[in-house]
Design a protein with these regions (language model features):
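P-loop NTPase catalytic phosphate-binding loop
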Residues: 1-43, 53-142, 146-150, 160, ...
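Conserved AAA+ ATPase small/helical "lid" subdomain
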Residues: 149-179
Length: 179
């Protein structure tokens, strides 16, 4: 779904085995950052930057349709084991990554417990919802009316848990290629 211009700015993975390699690398990076933070007695990335003088970059992992990724329906034993490893790495990063500057953006159409495991869902500190029916709105932000009030023609408009409505940017290939 992504043209060549996005590959300059993001590492796009479509194979589960390659994804696990990346997630293992992120888990290793998390452990390395823990060691570095401990050396300077920093509780989070902001303190680490202040105390060490090192402007450590944040890392953002984004997954569009995480439900599709984690769906075990019809999977054989080997694939289920692979997906369990992926899920475990995502859960680790969701639990510990934020303080160490490693962040997850996980998108799904239906963020219920059957699709997004509690270990991951409960550790995502911000939930955003686009236009949705009452049930989905309630699942995400607890207000059965909020997300359904976004106009049908408001493409890219979202609402946060606290009721803040915002308009997302739209980046087309031409815009990206000019950077």
């Amino acid at each position: 779904d992504f043209s060549y211009v996005w590959q300059e700015f993001a590492y796009i993975i479509t194979e589960e085995t390659k994804l696990l390699v990346l997630l293992n690398h992120l888990a290793d990076t998390l452990e390395e950052r823990k060691r570095l933070f401990k050396k300077v007695d920093a509780a989070n990335i902001i303190e680490y930057r202040e105390k060490s003088g090192d402007y450590m970059q944040r890392i953002v992992f984004a997954c569009d349709e995480v439900a599709e990724l984690l769906d075990k329906t019809g999977a054989d034993k080997a694939r289920k084991e692979l997906l369990a490893q992926i899920e475990a790495r995502l859960a680790l990063i969701a639990r510990q990554g934020r303080a160490f500057g490693i962040h997850l953006i996980l998108a799904t159409q239906r963020p219920d417990a059957n699709i997004l495991p509690g270990q991951i869902k409960n550790n995502m500190n911000i939930r955003i919802c686009g236009r949705a029916d009452t049930t989905l709105s309630t699942i995400i932000i607890g207000d059965g009316r909020a997300a359904e009030q976004i106009p049908h023609d408001a493409q890219g408009r979202f609402i946060m848990e606290d009721g803040t409505v915002f308009q997302a940017y739209y980046f087309n290939d031409d815009t990206i290629s000019k950077w």
